[in-house]
From Swiss-Prot:
Family from the record: Belongs to the universal ribosomal protein uS13 family.
Organism: Lactococcus lactis subsp. cremoris (strain MG1363)
Sorted UniProt keywords: Ribonucleoprotein, Ribosomal protein, RNA-binding, rRNA-binding, tRNA-binding
Protein name in the entry: Small ribosomal subunit protein uS13
HAMAP family, per the entry: Ribosomal_uS13
GO biological process, one term: translation
Basic residues composition-biased segments: 106-121
Region (Disordered) location: 88-121
Amino acid sequence: MARFAGVDIPNEKRIVISLTYVFGVGLQTSKKVLAAAGVSEDIRTKDLTSDQEDAIRRELDGLKLEGDLRREVSLNIKRLMEIGSYRGMRHRRGLPTRGQNTKNNARTRKGPAKSIAGKKK
């Protein structure tokens, strides 16, 4: 198994798909990295030469990935909560932050329904 940015990526898949297993690398970023490294998108991960692996690693080193990216996202959310912005308040209360209605739905964000004693329609 090849290892990029501390993540084992699958051998049998095409390299363009395998790179998306790294947090912070989607399909478009994967295509850009491979183009800059001069590696074909159709090659399988197991068929990469060591030179090609090194070229891909050099391109990935310039990106913010895995732990650094996760840390930045969590710090951004923490900053929103500290400054008391609307989005920060929604994060603090565990509600959707992007304007969705919460009267009937939003169960993923709010958690399981809490029954209210004596409430009947």
